[in-house]
Amino acid sequence: MALRIIFMGTPDFAVPILNSIINSQHRLLAIYTQNPKKSDRGQKINISPVHYFAKEKKIEVRSPKDLNLEEKIFIQKLNPDIIVVAAYGKIIPPEFLKIKNTKFINIHASLLPKWRGAAPIQRS
């Protein structure tokens, strides 16, 4: 049975996970990533590795400033079976975790709780 999946991720670590979902028999409903950020002296706008990868695959990306009521309603309408989170970089609000018939799975880059935090790969 194919699952209906929403993916939430941002850095390089998340790209192979997203690619695995795309290449599976499951149905990818949406991709969420952090919004583009200004960096460097020229204040160039940089998109996340997940956004760049999705753009290459011609898949639309959602990058809201906040996971608010509008996003919750959008997700509810998609009716996913599962939401896969891989280093998204935002805290998922508790009310999202209660969306009916939707489960969440978090893929972490290191062993928890020993290597928790913002830079688990570097610390491990």
Model regions: which residues?
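One-carbon transfer enzymes
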Residues: 1-124
